[in-house]
Amino acid sequence: MTRPNSARRLGAHASRAARLLPLFVSFVLLIVPLGAARHALTFDDFIGLDVVSDPQLSPDGSTVAFVVTDYSLEANRGNNSIWLVGVTGGEPRRLTAGAGSDSQPRWSPDGRQIAFVSDRGGEPQIYLISLSGGEARKASSLKMAPANLCWSPDGRSLAFSADITWPAKLGKEESYPTRALIWDNLMYRHWNEWRVGVRSHVFVISAAGGEARDLTPLDHDYPTLALGGNIDVTFTPDGKRLAVTANLDADPAVGTNNDILLVPVDGSDAVNLTKSNPANDNNPLFSANGRWMAYRAQLRAGFESDRTHLMLRDMTSGQTRDLTPDWQLSVGEILWAPDFAALYAEVEEQARSVIYKITLDGKREKVVSKGNNQSPRMTRDGRSLVVVRQASNQPADLFVIELATGTERRLSNVNEKALAELEMNPAEDFSFTGAKNERVHGLLVKPPFFDANRKYPLVYLIHGGPQSAMTDDFHARWNYQMFAAPGYVVAMVNFHGSTGYGQDFTDSISRHWGDYPYEDLMKGVDHLVATYPFIDGSRVGAAGASYGGYMIYWIATQTKRFKCLISHDGVFDAESMYGATEELWFPEWEFGGTPWTNRDLYMRWSPQNYSQNLSTPMLIVHSQLDYRVDLSQGLQAFTALRRQGVPARFVYFPDEGHWVVKARNRRVWWTEVLGWLEKYLKQ
């Protein structure tokens, strides 16, 4: 239910002088040297932390291009800039600067220039910049923003995807223009945008500039709107075709049948390479010699959280085999070894992302086990990996890891000065026996300046998905350190249904939304209070988003043990949620059918049907543009609470979707959330 591969880290540069002035005054009064000062994370600190993402290695493997994002409350938007750093180290240098936001850096095959997307001229366009110096050159004149940017192997052209009006002539009455939308099919909106009269298509354009040519002029979205990989548009090594992920079903709202198509650059008909699999295929990745195409596949149609297998297709014979047939874990981002004898895969395991080496005969070896590692990139000699690494007390930065020795070296340290002033504790692991008599794992973060002799309130964070997990990361939105900073112990339990603990564990939540996870969460509180004497079991609050928001509603109707609750974009009534969500395969899998074919399960697990039990004070957050869990879910819950006299507060964002991402709105979000916790947990 949470959007995959879309979490963005947001930050802003607040005035350093403005932040340090009150600290300076207080520390002078205490006669403490300013240089020794450390303080708990504040919102201004949080929004001021830069974010590192999207590392791209140069063709010779010597240099990493990457994106640094900073956010501004004044501008209420993020600004991306592209930076370069040598793999052997050195000071990173900024490649792009100016008023625009620059992203998607992609090296030309000869390594002499970088293509990227920028809105410096107004609408986002493709630009090229030479590594030898000079200004960036605009290479496109598009009406809508390009995405999925990639170079042809000969460096002469670029492929990308972009939204277009579809059909080209909608036949609207223009005598008296209106904003009316008319549709006949499902998937009329997705995530946070309306898709009526819009399609995403794949284009190719000369690197020298000119008109873009549509390679997919059909009534489908290329690449797919949902459940894609980190790469869903890529050239074949000979440059004659593009591999594109798309769902060609007549009604993509009810199925997960993404396929990988070979789309000829000359405009001839595409070939479906994965037609035999009715489930999700994505993320095509060719070996440079052209013999192999690796990709990811799920095998159960309609189940978005099925185990993701690593597949290998022989491009000569057409034979396909599964390299991970007997594994319980899912394969994330993948990359080829330089000798084409193995692939490397990012794999979520026990609340962290590790890196496995998987040979073409299916043998597996964990080669990076430390830390939480994303976006792996391999050096040309195959000896090292560049990764984006983060932890609950460490925002993302670039690291290079030598595979033979495990030696690590930091390549970027974009928040070094800011972090030196902050007091943040690392996440600690814990586990207990939960539902089905199975081990359940969690993370705990202590407040800054922790004193084991004190008693602290507990803030219990519940993840969405529900097939997801709370991981050891510096979360862009539900940041553990922000919750801990006012003086709370923060705990997260990866209940039955969570990812990273084997597919059987993940599967267990489907059709069991209110029993196994709820049992885990209640036993988790029992374990925490019994195990950690510094937790005050009489002052416990809980907060969750999406499925986590659903669980908050469920908890509110099942127990009175919490002092206060916070639900963000939660499901209150599963039956009415079905009629307003866009990806219908999700509730149909989770509840075993539609509301008219399996209504009993929708009724059984809907908190709305137990509204008479509501009594715990609750803060509800919901936004107008949330098309995953419609705004009406939050309104129904608020009505049920207030009609029965239960203290409640509603925070509404007219310009946000399932996530609150705009800088100023995030400020409001944190003010309200922390204020609610303080009101009920600090008494």
State what each model feature region is:
Residues 455, 466-480, 495, 632-633:
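The serine-hydrolase catalytic nucleophile loop
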